[in-house]
């Protein structure tokens, strides 16, 4: 409400005086702010506290406010004093509003000028709520009511449309009608008297002109008229009916009867009372009834409210009916219905035997005026003889809103009998009428009209009338508001009858619907006929077996907006079936009529037996629901029922879900619409009163409701075993007597809770007991039905899926391997259309025959508590078959079929481990007992090779189970032997963990689009490059396959540099199954490996320049896959321009501005724009003399890697490893990897990090003979080399991941180290790797002969001198790992870091500007 505070007065002032002060504050200039209203409230508190009395105008004048303390409050008091002085003095003392006469109403300050007008703004919902809250306890039309609205209007300057919206929000329908009538009359009178300033009749009505943006004073005049119309509202606090409220124990019927009596006695003639009853039946109802009526709304018809509150009423009360059910017609004159006795004591004298209207204590004074019906001043309206005679005819029927002259005097008894009752069906409230008149179409003399007792006038569609019928526009107030352009008044009478033979009545005023949507028979027709409407009483039987308390938590407590999913159309057959199903649910009390929001579609589904099943599609509601976790993970395994308690009985609960009631606040989400055939009648809406099937939380809520009674009965019979799942319950008892007692106690307990036990489904031993689709025998468990598998080729995809679903259900008792099932599963691939036709192969048909034979032996033994659990793992190429059994049992406990792993190759040892773990989980969950022994069909040599040679970390898990694992050779007794009808062949090449001397060596490598291999045995036998598709990994696989095809069938040592290919080869040679439909290249690789009697698989680090033969041959294979251009070389490695200078053709200068290193976009984006100064650090005098170590971090995708970097201070050779964790163990692992590739250092210099200073790391360095020292971190004079190396490596990684976002971290780091160590050239035109592996310094004696010089020239700096000018060039006499011996006099050894190769004088320049790449 803008800057206005709450209209509720603070302590110490009456409401009228507070409103006077607020209105005076509106005249302040500038306009009042929130601080002004706060000062005004503080002033009232101060006055009440200091003066010890309430504030009034006489006691709180302008002088009562201390100056300067309460802001502009003195100006407000002065304004109030000025206005009241001009109006003739101060008002009198205010009296409370609720006090009745003879007290005078409180004096209110007259409407004053509002000063400067506020800018117009539309109402916000929060403002409308605040206004309604302020006036909800004030009488409509009262002075305080008007004053409150006046202050709200001053704040927003509303247009006529805004005022109409305000009226609809704060007023009841009857008040809205009265206000609109009074406002229309006031506007017409003002326009006729020409008292409106600025009004021009030629430009439109006052409503139209005041809605313009520049209306100004004209809008103020409209607002004043709107407020003046509010003073004439019919309801006043003094009206007797406004003070009638429903008692806490009073039924809704008695409360409505009291309202009707009060309105009949006191309401003026001509004022409709139905809207007042509709409004007050909700507003003055008690809290419990208001909660029931919240979904229907406060302005719903009173009949709907009484039906909704019928259950709340006491049981000895009769439900209220505004209509009566006609009885059988009797000959002779019609007798009035007997007077019904009162249902309870009179609320006036609290005595029984008479109605409240006949109470002797009721005041019987003379009436204040003549009777409005017969104009007789001697009696009240309720005692009018005319009304009593009319009531005798109507007998409790529909009351007319206006006085109508009786027409029964001219009718015979037979005609009167026809008029007295209009029978209507509850589901179809329509009646046939016969019309005649000059304005009707000739074909519209008979029609079907909808009876609506809420409509005051009859409504006809416009297409029933001729085109030029006389009309007058009409404004109609309906449920959606005021409609001004849709309806017209028909200016001419029409004749109407309910039977062809009459009698006919004349209707003078009829509404015409121009949209041709409605044909309604209003209250005017039954009133003129003096007839009643008879509707058969709705039969609502109680819900049999509903729990006392509904669940308070069903997952919808957050009360989201209910879904509005439209009902889709149905054909006539399904619609009739749906109507029958809804009718049955309605009779059973599971559903009830619904008028609130929300909708989910419904449809029927035909069962196999021809019956129909009701389906409610609650997917939209389930999407809004928070799932409640179920108490049971799934159906129990019936083999877990031990054989010891032999006496079993099972029972089933009938319509179990329908016994759980649902609170009314959740019924919005469980509603649906029943469509009418052809849409000729209004649809009907219903909502569930109980938990429906299809609701996501219905199973969990039902389990929670049944959990406690089952626990109580189970505790009382502790020797019996209870098994339950949803509405199926089974009891196993040691004796027959205890079984009978347990059943009686459980059935009685369930009936007390309201559940129905289906006696026809109760069964017990000695006959087999059906339970959860299975049959429980004395020793075994079978399935009630087995699939027949009458399958022929071709077959549709839908039929094959159904067959596989049936097989999955009975698979735990079917003695078969995974192979025939896998054949059927493979036929489902690449088919998505359910109508697709599948051709089965002969092998698949043979698998179906095997399954059909296995189904004939489908059975499982029950668990014997005295015997241990044993397990068998049967490995096949299609998957694993797992068997859980006990010794001496006829059948196993269960069969389990598991597929291969998701990888291309599934190792046999891993499959055995996964099978054992799965069986252990099933044994513990079903029988709460671990497995004693595992048996398998895997060859012992293959299992030993996998355990000894596999690098899989899960080998440790299999070693923990090793004492319990036994091979198949022991042949233990058990039903699993039926599986060994065909022994599985385990083919694997002989694996050798160590290289085979004098054997053939195969090296392979790959690049994008090609692969290569070479064969070597004492000398190079064969080498070749072959084309390959797509990636480098597939290229290396193609090279390996070509090499294996070219190699003779003899032992071979295979060396690859791909980690993936290395892992795949080791998996295959150690024993593994490929996928049932393997990649052709993998299948060919497996067959090629089987050609060789012995195989060794080795991994060589890619791009290694080590001097051993393996690295040399691997480099030879790399040379078979050269890159064609220097641009491709730089795109792969992002090397510096010096490295490109080694490219043979074309030659590229290191300082060429057109070099690929200079033109590369990635390098231009990521290269630093400048470099820091080189600092002096402690360097080694030889390779592996002093190392520096550091840990840096690099983020790739969602992981942050710790890079453990080790740098040789002499050569700059670097090794780095990426680790996920940052522990001392990972640091030691990184150091070991660096020692493997670079050698062992003598000294290691690190920072003072926790990983390097830990006792474990220090002890490790001592054991390896490495001297450990520390430096200050991030210090350029002590840690500059490793910090610079960290930056170079991370720069290269960033470039690679910018070009290839999905490049694995290991490959990116390997490429970065290769580029940094072996490709990028230092200023001396040597790589770091060459410098690290160059020969040591030659020993030259002092008196020896000076070596001869070479052709190489070098520029040099002398060590220890401050002059940074390059000297030379001079030839190098000797080149060694530490430096070069220059031909000075005498010769001087100069380290490589102070040397620079000299090529041409004209090229000597600032080379750093041209070498900004990954190695500055």
From Swiss-Prot:
Gag polyprotein: Late-budding domains (L domains) are short sequence motifs essential for viral particle release. They can occur individually or in close proximity within structural proteins. They interacts with sorting cellular proteins of the multivesicular body (MVB) pathway. Most of these proteins are class E vacuolar protein sorting factors belonging to ESCRT-I, ESCRT-II or ESCRT-III complexes. Matrix protein p15 contains one L domain: a PPXY motif which binds to the WW domains of the ubiquitin ligase NEDD4. GO terms for biological process: DNA integration; DNA recombination; establishment of integrated proviral latency; proteolysis; symbiont entry into host cell; viral budding via host ESCRT complex; viral genome integration into host DNA; viral translational frameshifting. The record marks 109-110, 322-323, 419-420, 544-545, 1120-1121 as: Cleavage. Belongs to the retroviral Pol polyprotein family. This is Gag-Pro-Pol polyprotein. The active site is at residue 452. One of its GO terms (cellular component) is viral nucleocapsid. Its EC number is 3.4.23.-, 2.7.7.49, 2.7.7.7, 3.1.26.4. Residues 1179-1343 form the Integrase catalytic domain. Its cofactor is Mg(2+). Pfam families: Gag_p19, Gag_p24, Gag_p24_C, IN_DBD_C, RNase_H, rve, RVP, RVT_1. Residues 1352-1400 bind DNA. Mg(2+) 2 binds at residues 1005, 1036, 1057, 1118. Residues 996-1126 form the RNase H type-1 domain. A motif (PPXY motif) lies at residues 100-103. Mg(2+) 1 binds at residues 652, 727-728. Residues 586-776 form the Reverse transcriptase domain.
């Amino acid at each position: 409400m803008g800057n206005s505070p709450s209209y509720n007065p603070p302590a110490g002032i009456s409401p009228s005086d507070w409103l006077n002060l607020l209105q005076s504050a509106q005249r302040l200039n500038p306009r009042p702010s929130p601080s002004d209203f706060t000062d005004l409230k503080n002033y009232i508190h101060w006055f009440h506290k200091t003066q010890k009395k309430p504030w009034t105008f006489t006691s709180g004048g302008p002088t009562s406010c201390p100056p300067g303390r309460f802001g502009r409050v003195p100006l407000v008091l002065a304004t109030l004093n000025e206005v009241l002085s001009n109006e003739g003095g101060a008002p009198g003392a205010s009296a409370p509003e609720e006090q009745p006469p003879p007290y005078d109403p409180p004096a209110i300050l007259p409407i004053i000028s509002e000063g400067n007008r506020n800018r117009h703004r539309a109402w916000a919902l929060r403002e409308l709520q605040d206004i309604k809250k302020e006036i909800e306890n004030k009488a409509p039309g009262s002075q305080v009511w008007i004053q409150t609205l006046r202050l709200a209007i001053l704040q927003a300057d509303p247009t006529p449309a805004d005022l109409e919206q305000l009226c609809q929000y704060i007023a009841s329908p009857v008040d809205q009608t009265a206000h609109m009538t009074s406002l229309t009359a006031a506007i017409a009178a003002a326009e006729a008297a020409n008292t409106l300033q600025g009004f021009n009749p030629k430009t439109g009505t006052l409503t139209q002109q005041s809605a313009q943006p520049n209306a100004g004073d004209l809008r103020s005049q409209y607002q004043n008229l709107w407020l003046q119309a509010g003073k004439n509202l019919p309801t006043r606090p003094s009206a007797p009916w406004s003070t009638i409220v429903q008692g806490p124990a009073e039924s809704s019927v008695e409360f409505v009867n009291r309202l009707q009596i009060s309105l009949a006695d006191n309401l003026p003639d001509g004022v409709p009372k139905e809207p007042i009853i509709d409004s007050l039946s909700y507003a003055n109802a008690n809290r419990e009834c208001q909660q029931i009526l919240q979904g229907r709304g406060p302005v719903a018809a009173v009949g709907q409210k009484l039906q909704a509150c019928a259950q709340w009423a006491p049981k000895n009360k009769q439900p209220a009916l505004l209509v009566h059910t006609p009885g059988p017609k009797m000959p002779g004159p019609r007798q009035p219905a007997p007077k019904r006795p009162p249902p309870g004591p009179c609320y006036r004298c609290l005595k029984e035997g008479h109605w409240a209207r006949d109470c002797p204590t009721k005041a019987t004074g003379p009436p204040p005026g003549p009777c409005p019906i017969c104009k007789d001043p001697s009696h009240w309206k309720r005692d009018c003889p005319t009304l009593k005679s009319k009531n005798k005819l109507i007998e409790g029927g529909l009351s007319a809103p206006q006085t109508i002259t009786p027409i029964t005097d001219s009718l015979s008894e037979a005609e009167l009998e026809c008029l007295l009752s209009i029978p209507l069906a509850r589901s179809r409230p329509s009646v046939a009428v016969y019309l005649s008149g000059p304005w009707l179409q000739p074909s519209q003399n008979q029609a079907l009209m909808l009876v609506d007792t809420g409509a005051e006038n009859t409504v006809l569609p416009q297409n029933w009338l001729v085109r030029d019928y006389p009309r007058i526009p009409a404004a109609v107030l309906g449920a959606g508001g005021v409609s001004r352009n849709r309806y017209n008044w028909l200016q001419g009478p029409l004749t109407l009858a309910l039977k062809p033979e009459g009698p006919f009545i004349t209707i003078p005023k009829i509404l015409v619907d121009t949209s041709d949507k409605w044909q309604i028979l209003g209250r005017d027709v039954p009133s003129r006929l003096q007839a009643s409407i008879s509707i058969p009483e709705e039969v609502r039987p109680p819900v049999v077996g509903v729990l006392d308390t509904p669940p308070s938590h069903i997952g919808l407590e957050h009360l989201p907006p209910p879904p509005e999913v439209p009902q889709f159309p149905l054909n006539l057959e399904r619609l009739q079936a749906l109507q029958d199903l809804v009718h049955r649910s309605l009779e059973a009390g599971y559903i009830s009529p619904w008028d609130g929001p929300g909708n989910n579609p419904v449809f029927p589904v035909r069962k196999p037996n021809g019956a129909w099943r009701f389906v409610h599609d609650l997917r939209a509601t389930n999407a809004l629901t928070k799932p409640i976790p179920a108490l049971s993970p799934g159906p129990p395994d019936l083999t877990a029922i031990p054989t010891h308690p032999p006496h079993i009985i099972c029972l089933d609960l009938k319509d179990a879900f329908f016994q759980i009631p649902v609170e009314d606040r959740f019924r919005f989400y469980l509603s649906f619409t029943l469509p009418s055939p052809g849409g000729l009648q209004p649809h009907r809406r219903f909502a569930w009163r109980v938990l429906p099937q299809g609701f996501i939380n219905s199973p969990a809520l039902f389990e929670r409701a049944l959990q406690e009674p089952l626990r109580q009965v189970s505790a009382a019979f502790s020797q019996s075993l209870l098994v339950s799942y949803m509405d199926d319950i089974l009891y196993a008892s040691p004796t027959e007597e205890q079984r009978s007692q347990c059943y009686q106690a459980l059935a009685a307990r369930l009936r007390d809770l309201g559940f129905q036990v289906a006696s026809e489904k109760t069964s017990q031993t000695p006959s087999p007991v059906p339970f959860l689709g299975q049959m429980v025998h004395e020793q075994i468990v079978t399935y009630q039905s087995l699939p027949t598998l009458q399958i022929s080729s071709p077959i549709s995809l839908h039929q094959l899926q159904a067959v596989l679903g049936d097989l999955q259900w009975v698979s735990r008792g079917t003695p078969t391997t995974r192979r025939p099932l896998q054949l059927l599963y493979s036929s489902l691939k690449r088919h998505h259309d359910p109508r697709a036709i599948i051709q089965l192969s002969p092998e698949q048909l043979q698998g179906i025959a095997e399954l059909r034979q296995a189904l004939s032996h489908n059975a499982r033994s029950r668990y014997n508590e005295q015997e241990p659990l044993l397990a068998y793992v049967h490995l096949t190429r299609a998957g694993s078959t797992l068997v859980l059994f006990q010794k001496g049992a006829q059948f196993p406990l269960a069969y389990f079929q598991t597929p291969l792993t998701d990888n291309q190759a599934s190792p046999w040892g891993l499959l055995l481990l996964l099978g054992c773990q799965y069986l252990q989980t099933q044994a513990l969950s079903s029988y709460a007992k671990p497995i004693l022994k595992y048996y398998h069909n895997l060859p012992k040599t293959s299992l030993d090779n996998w355990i000894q040679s596999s690098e899989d970390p899960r080998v440790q898990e299999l070693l923990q189970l090793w004492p319990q694992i036994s091979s198949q050779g022991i042949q233990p007794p058990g039903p699993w032997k039926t599986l060994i009808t065909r022994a599985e062949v385990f083919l694997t090449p002989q694996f050798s963990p160590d290289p085979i001397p004098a054997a053939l060596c195969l090296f392979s490598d790959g690049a994008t689009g090609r692969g290569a291999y070479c064969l070597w045995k004492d000398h190079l036998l064969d080498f070749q490059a072959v084309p390959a598709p797509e990636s480098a990994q597939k290229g290396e696989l193609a090279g390996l396959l070509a090499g294996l095809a070219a190699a003779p069938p003899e032992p071979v040592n295979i060396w690859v540099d791909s980690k993936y290919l290395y892992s795949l080869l080791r998996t295959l040679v150690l024993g593994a199954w490929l996928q049932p439909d393997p990649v052709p290249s993998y299948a060919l690789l497996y067959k090629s490996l089987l050609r060789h009697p012995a195989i060794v698989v080795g991994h060589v680090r890619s791009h290694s320049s080590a001097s051993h033969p393996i690295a040399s041959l691997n480099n030879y294979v790399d040379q078979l896959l050269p890159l064609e251009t220097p641009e491709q070389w730089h795109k792969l490695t992002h090397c510096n321009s010096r490295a490109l200078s080694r490219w043979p053709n074309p030659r590229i200068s290191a300082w060429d501005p057109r070099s690929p290193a200079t033109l590369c976009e990635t390098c231009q984006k990521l290269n630093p724009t400048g470099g820091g100064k080189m600092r002096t650090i402690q360097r080694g005098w030889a390779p592996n003399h002093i190392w520096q170590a550091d840990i840096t971090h690099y983020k790739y995708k969602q992981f942050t890697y710790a890079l453990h970097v080790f740098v040789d201070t002499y050569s700059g050779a670097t090794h780095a490893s990426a680790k996920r964790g940052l522990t001392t163990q990972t640091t030691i692992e990184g150091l070991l990897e660096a020692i493997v590739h670079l050698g062992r250092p003598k000294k290691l210099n690190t920072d003072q990090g926790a990983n390097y200073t830990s006792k474990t790391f220090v002890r490790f360095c001592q054991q390896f003979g490495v001297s450990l020292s520390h430096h200050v971190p991030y210090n350029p004079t002590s840690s500059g080399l490793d910090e610079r190396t960290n930056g170079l490596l991370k720069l290269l990684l960033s470039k690679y991941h910018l070009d290839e976002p999905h490049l694995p971290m290991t490959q990116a780091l390997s490429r970065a180290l290769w580029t940094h160590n072996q490709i990028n050239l230092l200023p001396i035109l040597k790589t770091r790797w060459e410098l690290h592996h160059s020969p040591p310094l030659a020993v030259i004696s002092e008196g020896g002969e000076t070596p001869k010089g070479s052709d190489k020239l070098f520029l040099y700096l002398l060590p220890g001198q401050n002059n940074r000018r390059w000297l030379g060039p001079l030839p190098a006499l000797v080149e060694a790992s530490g430096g070069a011996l220059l031909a000075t006099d005498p010769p001087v050894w100069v380290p490589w870091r102070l040397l620079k190769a000299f090529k041409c004088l004209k090229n000597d320049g600032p080379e750093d500007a041209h070498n900004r790449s990954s190695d500055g």
